Structure formats: C-alpha cells, structure tokens
C-alpha cells in the first residue's frame, strides 16, 4: 500500500519521516511517497496535505490535476489528513481573505475557516492541547495557523483553542490547524495510520 504526501510545498519531509516512524512503531508496512504529479493519488490508500501557503497550494493542486484526484479519493473513502494550510484546502468555505484570492478549495469538509486565525508568521507558538482522540495532552505547534469558525453536523470537533476549532474529523477526513509533524509525538500520525489500515 502507498501513502501519498502532497509534495508541492510545506513540511513534506517531516510528514514523510513521521509516517515512516509511526509505521515502524506500529509494526505496519506501507510505502510513503511524495506526490508531485497527477497519477499517483489513485494508487494511495491514504493522503496527507501538508502546510504551506494555501493560495499557492490550491493553485498548484488544480494546475497539476491533483485536486480532482484527491476529491475522487475522498469520495471512495480514502483517509485524508490536512495540516495547517491543508485544513484550509479541505474546507468548503473560507473567509474574506480566501475569497479575495479566489482560492479553489476542495470542499471535502463541511467547515468554514479563518485563514490567519492565529496571526502572521511571527505569531508562531506552541500550546498544550486536549484532543478528543488522544488520552493525554498533545503539544500543538502553530505557525500562522488557521482556525475553523463553524462546521456542519457531520463534523466531529476534536479540539478547540481560543473558541476556534483547531482539530476536526468528518468520516475519512482529519484536519488540524497545527503541525503534528514538527513534534516527536507520533500519536496523531498513528491514529491516521489506523484509519488507513481499517479502510484497506
């Protein structure tokens, strides 16, 4: 089985490394691949959309033909993890900033996002988070992070910070405003792997 990490921009190598370590710890076997072009996603049993700059990410996903492949994979129930800008890309609706830049969001999650909910790049910070799927706090690394301001009834809220939703799940899709790949804590990647292998 392949797990594809969208490798257009963002913390790509960190996600690949975290997934490989999580696979090893779980005693699972899968090939983690960097996805740069159309044609790889249909072979993947799991997809990661890393952080980066959401406007550029949306444009490149559409241009490379990867956006439609991700939508098709999601419709088939393939587990998808989006972190930071990945959370924005997965959403159905953005704020005025997103509308202004004409970003073509994937619309896979029934969520509305505030693109820079936690400020600009200089406003990076860490916070101890209670995340519903974990049995103890998780250190969230936030870098110019977005936040979910509202969501539909099918969305399960997993964590909040400052009245904003920062982790949510809708069926096969998991979206985080923070960067689990920038910590040594593999629990979220392991949770995602469990979703992938249950779906396989």
Curated annotation (Swiss-Prot):
UniProt keyword list: Glutamine amidotransferase, Hydrolase, Lyase, Pyridoxal phosphate
GO CC terms, sorted: cytosol; glutaminase complex
Residues of the active site: 84 (nucleophile), 179 (charge relay system), 181 (charge relay system)
Biological process per Gene Ontology, one example term: glutamine catabolic process
InterPro entries found in the cross-reference section: Class_I_gatase-like, PdxT/SNO, PdxT/SNO_CS
Example GO molecular function: pyridoxal 5'-phosphate synthase (glutamine hydrolysing) activity
NCBIfam families in alphabetical order: PLP_synth_Pdx2
Subunit and interaction comment: In the presence of PdxS, forms a dodecamer of heterodimers. Only shows activity in the heterodimer.
Biological role stated in the UniProt entry: Catalyzes the hydrolysis of glutamine to glutamate and ammonia as part of the biosynthesis of pyridoxal 5'-phosphate. The resulting ammonia molecule is channeled to the active site of PdxS.
Entry-linked PANTHER family: PYRIDOXAL 5'-PHOSPHATE SYNTHASE SUBUNIT SNO, PYRIDOXAL 5'-PHOSPHATE SYNTHASE SUBUNIT SNO1-RELATED
The family this protein is said to belong to: Belongs to the glutaminase PdxT/SNO family.
Protein name: Pyridoxal 5'-phosphate synthase subunit PdxT
């Amino acid at each position: 089985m392949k797990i594809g990490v969208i490798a257009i921009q963002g913390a790509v190598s960190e996600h690949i490394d975290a997934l490989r370590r999580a696979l090893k710890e779980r005693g699972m076997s899968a090939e983690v691949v960097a996805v740069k072009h159309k044609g790889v996603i249909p072979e993947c049993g799991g997809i990661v959309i890393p952080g980066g700059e959401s406007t550029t990410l949306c444009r490149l996903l559409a241009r490379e033909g990867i956006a439609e492949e991700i939508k098709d994979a999601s419709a088939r129930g393939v587990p998808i993890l989006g972190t930071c800008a990945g959370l924005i890309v997965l959403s159905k609706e953005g704020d005025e900033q997103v509308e202004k830049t004409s970003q073509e969001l994937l619309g896979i999650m029934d969520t509305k996002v505030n693109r820079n909910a936690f400020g600009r790049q200089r406003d990076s910070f860490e916070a101890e988070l209670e995340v519903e799927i974990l049995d103890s706090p998780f250190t969230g690394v936030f870098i110019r992070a977005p936040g979910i301001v509202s969501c539909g009834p099918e969305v399960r809220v997993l964590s909040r910070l400052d009245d904003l939703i920062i982790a949510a799940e809708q069926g096969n899709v998991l979206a985080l405003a923070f960067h689990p790949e920038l910590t040594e804590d593999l629990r979220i990647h392991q949770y995602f792997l469990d979703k992938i292998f249950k779906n396989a």
